[in-house]
Amino acid sequence: MAIQAPKGTKDILPTESYKWHYLEDKFKNIADSYGYREIRTPVFEYTELFQRGVGETTDVVQKEMYTFLDRAGRSLTLKPEGTSPAVRAFVEGSLYNEAQPTKLFYFTPVLRYENVQKGRLREHHQFGIEAFGSREASLDAEVISLAMRIYEELGVDGIELNINSIGCSKCRKEYNDILKTFLSKQYDNICDTCKTRFHKNPMRILDCKEKSCREIVKDAPLMLHHLCDECREHFESLKMYLEGLGIGYKINPLIVRGLDYYSKTVFEIINKNITICGGGRYDYLIEEVGGPKMPAVGFGMGIERTLLTLSENGIEIPKLPYIDLYIGIIGDKARIKALTLTNKLREKNVRCEYDHMNRSVKAEMKYANKINARFTVILGENEIESGIAKFKRMEDGQQFEISLGDLSAILNLTRM
């Protein structure tokens, strides 16, 4: 039996990889325009980073992490999310000593042991944005506007932005007491996981997907009604900035996100009732992992989920020509000429290929069509002796007679 990829993983083959290149270029160009710089972090970290950052009681830490001991007995975890490693790198690299805010973006694999379903794999890939150093709601609005601009440029309609504030450590402590009083009356009816959350982080119960818990929290007191003055002002400022940017939003008081490091702003971007991007502010995480007391805000956007969103909205990613010039060959002399010509063209960054399979001329043209070549040329005895060949534009069949020694003319043709 042939060995297959592990359940929940997927190979990205050439028939799909061009879509990834398109999205990655789009994400990077937009991030660049906002002043963000790229960061790359290891695929595994010390387990403690996620226990302290993501939260001991979260589903991610309790149920979904790939954790193992190395040969020295140290507990390591394949990263289940991108923010904590970015924060760890920010602290370890002393980026807090730079002029603030520090704006970073990254592409990273994310690994979680989850039930495999449409749009959800055990290894998926994430584009992340993290902005450090400012408490101003204007930075939250900028981060949100960056995410919204991505979907706008991709042409996705029906995007809905949901926002909420989950307060700071001060007002959240008071709210948790109020929430626990409410939930205590329904304690026997909440799920076993939420019974644990009740004692450690009751606000996480608002995020539970169990039907019984979702029914109970419909009548729960809302964090928005118990914000301190500072958090209320911050949330009002966020709404003002979003309105100033012309970004519509819906206030959803049940958004808390599934990770414990969030504070104040949390948001989700939704399309066709599916969350396609999520993020928020995390003003305590940097200090939690050993850095200075410093605020931050960011988001994560799944690349697979974005591709699925494009597909479900009927949006096709343009497929660029794989080859600029395909050279067909008749005879050994032509093969030598094709070898030298392709080598010169490749040095000029022209994507070119020649026949390695001793195909017939008909088969060569069929192959050129399959690889989406823009131009083709057949080199045989006559072309080698005369030094002149006819280059064919595959799109419309137009032919161009060019000297094989005139490299600049061939270059100009392939760049048409």
Swiss-Prot record:
It holds the Pfam family HGTP_anticodon. It is found in: Cytoplasm. GO terms for biological process: histidyl-tRNA aminoacylation. Coiled coil: none annotated. Keywords: Aminoacyl-tRNA synthetase, ATP-binding, Cytoplasm, Ligase, Nucleotide-binding, Protein biosynthesis. HAMAP family: His_tRNA_synth. Belongs to the class-II aminoacyl-tRNA synthetase family. Its EC number is 6.1.1.21. Homodimer. It catalyses: tRNA(His) + L-histidine + ATP = L-histidyl-tRNA(His) + AMP + diphosphate + H(+). This is Histidine--tRNA ligase. The lineage of its organism: Bacteria, Bacillati, Bacillota, Clostridia, Eubacteriales. PANTHER family: HISTIDINE--TRNA LIGASE, MITOCHONDRIAL-RELATED, HISTIDYL-TRNA SYNTHETASE. It comes from Clostridium kluyveri (strain ATCC 8527 / DSM 555 / NBRC 12016 / NCIMB 10680 / K1). The keyword Metal-binding does not apply. It comes from the Bacteria. InterPro entries: aa-tRNA-synth_II, aa-tRNA-synth_II/BPL/LPL, Anticodon-bd, Anticodon-bd_dom_sf, His-tRNA-ligase, HisRS-like_core, HisRS/HisZ, HisRS_anticodon. GO terms for cellular component: cytoplasm. Its main location: cytoplasm. GO terms for molecular function: ATP binding; catalytic activity, acting on a protein; histidine-tRNA ligase activity; transferase activity. Transmembrane segments: none annotated.
